[in-house]
Amino acid sequence: NIALGQDQSGR
């Protein structure tokens, strides 16, 4: 989740 930050926020 936070570790990625890509798929979630897309930023």
Curated annotation (Swiss-Prot):
Keyword vocabulary terms for this entry: Amidation, Cytolysis, Secreted
UniProt GO BP: killing of cells of another organism
Expressed, tissue-wise, as follows: Expressed by the venom gland.
Cell compartments where the protein resides: Secreted
Q: What else is known?
A: The primary structure of this cryptide Pep-4 is identical to that of cryptide Pep-4 from Tityus serrulatus (AC P85840).
Protein name (Swiss-Prot/TrEMBL): Cryptide Pep-4
What role is this protein assigned? Presents weak lactate dehydrogenase (LDH) release from mast cells. Does not induce hemolytic activity, mast cell degranulation, and antimicrobial effects. In vivo, injection into mice causes moderate edema formation, but induces very weak or no change in nociceptive sensibility. It also causes an alteration in rearing (standing on hind limbs), but does not impact locomotion.
User: Which superkingdom is the protein from?
Assistant: Eukaryota
Name a GO CC annotation attached to this entry.
extracellular region
- What are the Arginine amide sites (modified residues) in this protein? R11
User: Where does this protein chiefly localize?
Assistant: secreted
The answer to whether keyword Secreted applies is: yes
- Which species expresses this protein natively? Tityus obscurus (Amazonian scorpion)
